Curated annotation (Swiss-Prot):
This is Small ribosomal subunit protein uS2. It comes from the Bacteria. PANTHER family: 30S RIBOSOMAL PROTEIN S2 PROKARYOTIC AND ORGANELLAR (PTHR12534), SMALL RIBOSOMAL SUBUNIT PROTEIN US2M (PTHR12534:SF0). GO terms for cellular component: cytosolic small ribosomal subunit. HAMAP family: Ribosomal_uS2_B. The keyword DNA damage does not apply. NCBIfam families: rpsB_bact. Pfam families: Ribosomal_S2 (PF00318). The gene is rpsB. GO terms for molecular function: structural constituent of ribosome. One of its GO terms (biological process) is translation. Transmembrane segments: none annotated. It comes from Neisseria meningitidis serogroup C / serotype 2a (strain ATCC 700532 / DSM 15464 / FAM18). Belongs to the universal ribosomal protein uS2 family.
Length: 242
């Protein structure tokens, strides 16, 4: 698992919070001080908390768990998609659809529609559809793919959710709380840590910082998968030896 260092966090600007006038008092315990009217996050707290989050992810995935990566704001979208894909985990990078978890039954129907439309599009030319009809089908598929593409292979509700910017993803937190799904989240000085099981206090606007968090969590996922694989192989060898 990648060992993130204090130096890497400083270089990525993890310690830069929001303007002091926008602060959330619930984040006071994680704030070191202020510089030029900007809150400075205490990285001596952030680093071990991030490591705790990584360890929780590793354990969960080693037990065949699923982590849903969520980051729909502009700076986070591409990074969330890339790192979740690298880790082989589901993600939401475009827009959080209300009921994505609490109304998962309906979402599953939409995913089925996406699969059917994708299959129909692949055979559209041979099936005699006009160019105009094919173009309309493409637009439909692209629209559904944007909203649901990252979760189309998710087998059921996730076991945990990793979130960038709790203020931006309020809907995600509300649904996770309703369903009792633990949340691992980057929480900046202007947001509340309420409803987050594993808080990572830090900058949620810098692309460099977001890349650092996502890479660290994705690495933890891959380590958990590797552990699960090793345990499966060891069990198979043991069974064969008996």
């Amino acid at each position: 698992m990648s060992q993130i260092t204090m130096r890497q966090m400083i270089e990525a600007g993890v310690h830069f919070g929001h303007q002091t006038r926008f602060w959330n008092p619930k984040m006071a315990q994680y704030i070191f001080g202020a510089r030029n009217k900007i809150h400075i996050v205490n990285l001596e707290k952030t680093l071990p908390m991030f490591q705790d989050a990584q360890e929780a992810v590793r354990r969960l995935v080693a037990n065949k768990g699923t982590v849903l990566f969520v980051g729909t704001k502009r700076q986070a979208r591409d990074i969330i998609r890339e790192e979740a894909t690298r880790a082989g985990m589901p993600f939401v990078d475009h827009r959080w659809l209300g009921g994505m978890l609490t109304n998962y039954k309906t979402v599953k129907q939409s995913i089925k529609r996406l699969e059917e439309k994708t299959a129909a599009l692949e055979n559209a030319a041979e099936s005699g559809f006009s160019k105009k009809e094919i173009l309309e089908m493409q637009r439909d598929v692209e629209k559904l793919e944007r909203s649901l593409g990252g979760i189309k292979n998710m087998k059921g509700l996730p076991d945990a959710i990793f979130v960038i910017d709790t203020g931006y993803q309020k809907g995600t937190l509300v649904e996770a709380e309703k369903l009792g799904i633990p949340v691992i989240a980057v929480v900046d000085t202007n947001n509340s840590p309420d409803g987050v099981k594993y808080v990572i206090p830090g900058n949620d606007d810098s692309a460099k910082a977001i890349r650092l968090y996502c890479r660290g969590i994705a690495d933890a996922v891959l380590e958990g998968k590797n552990q699960a694989l090793q345990e499966t192989v060891a069990a198979a060898q043991e069974a064969a030896a008996e």
